């Protein structure tokens, strides 16, 4: 359950930061949320790989591991929602749809 705890804490912080950025209309804080989402996605992928290995090693664990995977997927999705809030904050502040901008393009937009 270490992955669930780690990702859960990260996502909780992301959601809090996204809502704070929205409240303050702070695009820089929103950018940090978007950056954190990439880490959540990476951690989610690593956790899935670890769980695949565990299922291959011990078939009796498949049911409980699948439950963990569903929890992790839900947490990852919450992180995506926090990222969507952050994108809306930037849109409200700059009037630009940033959903498909690269990290470099987004940094340039907020710098200028």
Predicted regions and their residues:
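Cytosolic, long alpha-helical scaffolding segments
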Residues: 1-112
């Amino acid at each position: 359950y270490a992955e669930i705890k780690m990702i859960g804490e990260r996502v909780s912080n992301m959601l809090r930061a996204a809502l704070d950025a929205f409240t303050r209309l702070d695009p820089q804080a929103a950018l940090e949320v978007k950056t954190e989402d990439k880490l959540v996605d990476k951690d989610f992928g690593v956790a899935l790989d670890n769980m695949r290995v565990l299922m291959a090693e011990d078939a009796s664990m498949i049911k409980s591991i699948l439950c963990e995977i569903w929890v992790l997927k839900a947490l990852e999705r919450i992180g995506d929602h926090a990222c969507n809030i952050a994108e809306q904050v930037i849109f409200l502040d700059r009037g630009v749809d940033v959903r498909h901008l690269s990290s470099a393009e987004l940094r340039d937009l907020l710098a200028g």
